């Protein structure tokens, strides 16, 4: 008689992200993970380079898949036990332009003043590579955020806190930037950097225990 026993679940996954927010969000839904970060000889930033004329949704999907493939190669080279690998990437877009991580304080201030008093989109793509090395179809979370028309001085003070650096669009919704946000339509966790609804669905497909 055929066995009805389901394949065993993986007790952990590999998270290929340095983002503390993504780590916190995985812990929020009970996922155990081990970090799988780029080696010193890897140029992780090069994967985030834009292609001419590339739309924001195509960009964030492409970057996420590229990061996932790099992480899978890193795992194989490390000799660590096989387990699913999770990668995500977030970008902000307004007027068809992609706003990545600010290069410096002036860049951060320019981004924030561009967002002021207007609505923009936050796109986060999530990719999971199964323990067998197969890439699951990536998920895309799309949210709208409206910033208040705050005074320029308020944005200057925000930049001086250092919080905008390393954040797409130069702000963190879970931090002090919350004072500028009039409303959102979409996924709060997606805006933070890891949409939990879509992520949970991918992890179930990859048979990750949580």
Curated annotation (Swiss-Prot):
Reaction equation(s) it catalyzes: dTTP + H2O = dTMP + diphosphate + H(+); UTP + H2O = UMP + diphosphate + H(+)
Keyword Cytoplasm applies: yes
Subcellular location: Cytoplasm
The EC number(s) this enzyme carries: 3.6.1.9
Alphabetic keyword roster: Cytoplasm, Hydrolase, Nucleotide metabolism
Classification via Pfam families: Maf
Gene Ontology molecular function: dTTP diphosphatase activity; UTP diphosphatase activity
InterPro entries: ITPase-like_fam (IPR029001), Maf-like (IPR003697)
Gene Ontology biological-process annotations: nucleotide metabolic process
Cofactor: a divalent metal cation
Active site: 89 (proton acceptor)
Keyword presence, Membrane: no
Site feature: Important for substrate specificity: 21, 90, 174
Coiled coil: none
Cellular component per GO, a single term: cytoplasm
Family as reported in the entry's similarity comment: Belongs to the Maf family. YhdE subfamily.
Chain's role: Nucleoside triphosphate pyrophosphatase that hydrolyzes dTTP and UTP. May have a dual role in cell division arrest and in preventing the incorporation of modified nucleotides into cellular nucleic acids.
Protein name from the UniProt record: dTTP/UTP pyrophosphatase
């Amino acid at each position: 008689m055929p066995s009805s026993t389901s394949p065993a679940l993986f007790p952990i996954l590999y998270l290929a992200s340095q983002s503390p927010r993504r780590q916190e969000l995985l812990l929020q839904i009970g996922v155990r993970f081990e970090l799988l970060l780029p080696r010193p000889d890897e140029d992780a930033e090069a994967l985030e380079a834009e292609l001419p004329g590339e739309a924001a949704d195509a960009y964030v999907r492409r970057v996420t898949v590229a990061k996932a493939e790099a992480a899978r190669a890193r795992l194989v080279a490390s000799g660590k036990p096989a387990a699913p690998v999770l990668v995500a990437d977030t970008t902000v877009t307004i007027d068809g332009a992609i706003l990545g991580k600010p290069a410096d304080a002036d860049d951060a201030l320019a981004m924030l003043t561009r967002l002021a008093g207007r609505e923009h989109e936050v796109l986060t793509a999530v990719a999971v590579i199964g323990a067998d090395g197969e890439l699951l179809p990536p998920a895309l979370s799309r949210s709208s955020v409206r910033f208040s028309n705050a005074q320029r001085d308020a944005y200057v003070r925000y930049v001086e806190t250092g919080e905008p650096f390393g954040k797409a669009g130069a702000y963190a919704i879970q931090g002090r930037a919350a004072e500028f946000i009039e409303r959102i339509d979409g996924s709060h966790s997606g805006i933070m950097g890891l949409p939990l609804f879509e992520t949970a669905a991918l992890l179930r497909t990859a048979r990750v225990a949580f």
